Curated annotation (Swiss-Prot):
GO terms for biological process: D-galacturonate catabolic process; D-glucuronate catabolic process; pectin catabolic process. InterPro entries: KduI, KduI/IolB_isomerase, KduI_N, RmlC-like_jellyroll, RmlC_Cupin_sf. This is 4-deoxy-L-threo-5-hexosulose-uronate ketol-isomerase. Keywords: Isomerase, Metal-binding, Zinc. The gene is kduI. Belongs to the KduI family. Its EC number is 5.3.1.17. It comes from Tolumonas auensis (strain DSM 9187 / NBRC 110442 / TA 4). Catalyzes the isomerization of 5-dehydro-4-deoxy-D-glucuronate to 3-deoxy-D-glycero-2,5-hexodiulosonate. Its cofactor is Zn(2+). Binds 1 zinc ion per subunit. It comes from the Bacteria. It holds the Pfam family KduI. Pathway: Glycan metabolism; pectin degradation; 2-dehydro-3-deoxy-D-gluconate from pectin: step 4/5.
Length: 278
């Protein structure tokens, strides 16, 4: 499990490209028949990926030891969205079939969790966020049809997109974790512009649905001290509460957003006027 520390904005603005990428970019999320996890001290979120191919991948007790407990979900909840082929997640003996762009919420206290692919030729890719929890809520699958969609933006400004809210209070209860998926329409390249920050939550963006020759210029930093990261397919960016988070791609793409922090109010954000960005 990699560890990333919280960075003060006065420190972050001193980084060169390599320094920014080291602290905020997560590059290699999916490894065949393995689980990759990155622990961030920003609200103590864990970001990871699981790609079972011909083997079943299990959340081992060793992962719990790395966060000071007997098993990973002893004091944590977990949300995942599948961005690959069909798969099965088994939680405490109950199997959940999770198709492409379907989600699963796993409540605190589940000790036995395993991941498998339905077809090794088209393996599942489970992208996950895991956050501290204070109580147990029921484990539940969320399909695309059950998510709460909101379409925003305009073709003229290149930001026509549909925000699909999977793990939000309107769909199911969680302790603090909120997750969803935003899909840009063809010919649109901007996300979250005009941009915002949210003082009471951190956020992680996971970009996917891109060709190997495409990229997203992800903008970050304080509104008057912006920087950028070049992000490629199936890579994630940690966004502290003080940082803007928006991007423009060489063509359309999809991204998963996950938030943890003070509240679960999706619209609790501090909007930044485009003319005020530096």
């Amino acid at each position: 499990m990699q560890v990333r520390h919280n960075i003060h904005p006065d420190h972050a603005k001193q980084f060169d490209t390599a320094g920014l990428r080291k602290e905020f970019l997560i590059e290699n999320l999916f490894i065949a028949n393995d689980i990759t996890l990155t622990y961030s001290h920003i609200d103590r979120i864990i970001v990871g990926g699981v790609m079972p191919v011909e083997q079943t991948v299990v959340l081992s007790p060793e992962l719990g030891k790395q966060v000071g407990v007997a098993y990973l979900l002893e004091r944590r909840e977990l949300g995942l969205i599948n961005v690959g082929g069909a798969g099965v997640v088994t939680v405490s003996g109950q199997a959940y079939e999770i198709g492409n762009q379907e989600a699963l919420y796993i409540g605190m206290g589940n000790q036995e969790v395993s991941f498998a692919s339905t077809d090794a030729a088209h393996p599942a890719k489970f992208y996950l966020n895991c956050a501290p929890a204070h109580t147990t809520y029921p484990t539940r699958k969320v399909t695309q049809a059950e998510a709460r969609p909101v379409t925003l933006g305009d073709n003229a400004t290149g930001n026509r997109r549909t925000i699909n809210k999977y793990l939000v209070p309107d769909v199911l209860p969680t302790c603090q974790l909120v997750m969803g998926l935003t899909r840009l329409e063809e010919g649109n390249m901007w996300n979250s512009m005009p941009c915002h920050t949210h003082e009471r939550r951190m956020e992680v963006y996971f970009y996917f649905d891109m060709t190997e020759n495409d990229t997203v210029f992800h903008f970050m930093g304080e509104p008057q001290e912006t920087r950028h990261l070049l992000v490629h397919n199936e890579q994630a960016v940690l966004s502290p509460s003080w940082s803007i988070h928006c991007g423009v791609g060489t063509r359309r793409y999809t991204f998963i957003w996950g938030m943890v922090g003070e509240n679960q109010v999706f619209d609790d954000m501090d909007h930044i006027a485009i003319r005020d960005i530096r």
